UniProtKB/Swiss-Prot annotation:
Top-tier EC class: ligase
Catalytic activity: tRNA(Arg) + L-arginine + ATP = L-arginyl-tRNA(Arg) + AMP + diphosphate
SUPFAM superfamilies: Anticodon-binding domain of a subclass of class I aminoacyl-tRNA synthetases (SSF47323), Arginyl-tRNA synthetase (ArgRS), N-terminal 'additional' domain (SSF55190), Nucleotidylyl transferase (SSF52374)
Keywords: Aminoacyl-tRNA synthetase, ATP-binding, Cytoplasm, Ligase, Nucleotide-binding, Protein biosynthesis
Keyword field contains Ligase: yes
Protein name: Arginine--tRNA ligase
């Protein structure tokens, strides 16, 4: 129970006793640093129902609390704010109550509540994962873990875009230029090999366009008449017709990609419970179009195409079925959402982790599903996020200059290795221990740098800055965790028992207060779908711990009771760091 939850009934009782008025809600905020207090009650809303001035009202309530509530030590009133100082005994009791809770702040899933399905990654099978996919995967995975910790049952899913003209481009280029090359013969990961032929297609396509332009064609005509694009379109038609040879090639090359993706996901530390494939879902939703027509949600134009008119909602008309009866992406997404609830009947909401260029698409999708009458449609959320840039500029795709996810992770590990070696504290480590540490630091730096930023904001990712061992970075927090583990290893006495301590040092109290916030931060992060709240809370906790570490003796404290309490407090901080970082998918090293 939080401090505000503890104080609310006591303040409501005080108002009832003192003024014979009942109030439903008490407003709290964090006490400003320049004032004494641990929590602040806002007085102004009460002036609507109680005839008094803020100072008199605050003093009367404060006096009542000091006399009747054991947790309240003293108070002060500044303007319309009642600053409440909480007794040390409250914080000692709180700490003793949570000291041995291994997953403090985490809630078990409520069996009465509906589950949430979180979709992320959802790549195309024609190239490797890139930097944009890294942000997508890290956000989706982290939000799924945060929702779990907040007490939700969660399914992690992705829909793999394994069909369409872009897939046929890689297939055709491999057929033309590949000479039977395989991942084994080329020593390339399967996704990289297929991506190589996507680039080869684009090069050949551009060459043919230029040749046609030289013969007098316009660029527009050349793009349509280039022989290689016509061949790719013919291959797509064969795929749709179930041509055995094309399907066999498609399956073979897709499997190469899946094997490559699996390695990337393992290295990135993300996973999935359920896979969907566009080749299985692209026909879904067409049957729903008729339902929508019958309900008057959709309307049919004279040419036979089917639309939805969302102009009353501030949007426009959106096509859901072409005049030739073929589906559009919107139709597929409608059908896939419905299919997911059929597959997992306990799902009551979905989170779609997709870039902000699709904001409009998801507004329309969610509105359509609501209008079709699905009760779970009100619990759909688009986890929209901004582009990731490197200092050298934006990512590109077809020219082969994309920032590859595997290369990025390796670069981060190499950067961590260079910085760690420069610091020169790894003499006692074996080669394997060093390699594991470099990866832990490098990936921790990458993940933290990306996740500490509000998802909606664009990121300029600076690899060197992210691996800094000072400031708001993953390695700084990992180093603090490792420092605490060192303290615990050196504590050559029993510090397991509950300690009764009369008075807390100011830094001890501030640290316990920071720990106390963790459950509320998890709930806020879940409600806002924001790993940034977890990341920045963890940084604040670590800053508070380092201030404590600099201000008091821990193992050097002469008073055994204080020494035991400070080791226990350090241990709890480490546990919260580890728990918080687990929600971000970041590992913490036991020593650094």
């Amino acid at each position: 129970m939080s401090l505000s939850q503890i104080l609310t009934p006591s303040i409501q009782k005080a108002i009832q006793v003192l003024f014979d008025v009942s109030v439903d809600k008490i407003e709290f905020q964090t006490t400003r640093k320049e004032f004494e207090g641990d929590i602040t009650m806002v007085i102004f809303p009460l002036l609507k129902v109680i005839k008094s001035n803020p100072a008199e009202l605050g003093n009367k309530i404060g006096t009542y609390l000091v006399e009747n509530v054991s947790e309240v030590a003293r108070f002060n009133v500044v303007s319309g704010f009642l600053n409440i100082v909480i007794s040390d005994s409250y914080y000692v009791d709180f700490f003793n109550g949570i000291k041995d809770q291994k997953q403090f702040g985490f809630l078990s899933p409520n069996p009465e509540e509906k589950a949430v399905m979180v979709e992320y990654s959802s790549p195309n099978t024609n190239k490797p994962l890139h930097l944009g996919h890294v942000r997508n995967n890290l956000l989706g995975y982290s939000v799924a873990e945060i929702l779990k910790a907040s007490g939700k049952k969660v399914y992690k899913t992705q829909i793999i875009n394994d069909r369409g003209i872009h897939i046929c481009k890689s297939m055709l280029a491999w057929e033309k230029f590949g000479n039977g090359e395989t991942p084994e013969s080329s020593d390339l990961k399967g996704d990289k090999l297929v991506g190589k032929y996507y680039v080869e297609f684009d090069k050949a396509y551009k060459t043919e366009i230029n040749q046609l332009i030289e013969t007098g064609k316009t660029e527009e005509e050349a793009k349509k008449q280039a022989p290689i694009i016509i061949e790719a379109q013919e291959m797509l038609k064969k795929w749709e017709a179930g041509d055995e040879q094309v399907i066999a090639l498609w399956k073979k090359m897709n499997q190469w990609v899946y094997d490559g993706f699996a390695t990337t996901y393992t290295n990135l530390g993300v996973n999935f419970d359920k896979y969907y494939y566009e080749s299985n879902t692209y026909l879904l939703g067409k049957d729903v179009v008729q339902v929508g027509l019958d309900k008057g949600v959709f309307e049919k134009d004279p040419d036979g195409s089917v639309w939805i008119d969302l102009t009353d909602e501030g949007l426009d008309r959106k096509i859901v079925l072409r005049s030739d009866g073929t589906a559009v992406y919107m139709t597929q997404d409608i059908g896939t959402a419905i299919q997911r609830v059929k597959d997992m009947p306990d799902v009551g909401g979905m989170v779609y982790t997709v870039g902000n260029e699709q904001d409009y698409h998801f507004k329309v999708l969610f509105l359509i599903l609501k209008k079709l009458g699905f009760d779970w449609a009100s619990s759909l959320y688009h986890l929209s996020y901004g582009m990731v840039d490197l200092p050298s500029g934006k990512m590109k795709s077809r020219e082969g200059t994309v920032v590859d996810a595997d290369d990025l992770m390796q670069d981060m590990t190499d950067t961590a290795k260079q910085i760690a070696e420069d610091l020169g504290k790894l003499d006692s480590y074996s080669a394997d221990e060093k390699a594991k540490l470099y990866k832990t630091i490098g990936l921790g730096a990458l993940k933290y740098y990306i996740l500490k930023v509000d998802p909606k904001k664009r990121i300029l990712f600076n690899p060197e800055e992210s691996v800094d061992f000072a400031g708001n970075t993953g390695p700084f927090i990992q180093y603090t965790y490792a420092r605490i583990q060192s303290i615990i290893r050196k504590a050559d006495f029993d510090f397991s028992n509950k300690i009764e301590i009369e008075e807390l040092h100011e830094k001890e109290k501030e640290l316990v207060k920071q720990i106390e916030l963790f459950p509320e931060v998890i709930q806020n992060a879940a409600q806002n779908h924001s790993p940034a709240l977890i990341a920045n809370y963890t940084y604040d906790l670590v800053k508070e711990y380092n201030s404590f570490y600099q201000s008091v003796h821990i193992l050097g404290e002469a008073d055994l009771t204080k020494k035991i309490f400070r080791v226990q407090l350090s241990q709890k901080v480490a546990e919260v760091i580890k728990s918080a970082f687990s929600l971000l998918g970041i590992e913490v090293p036991e020593r650094m």
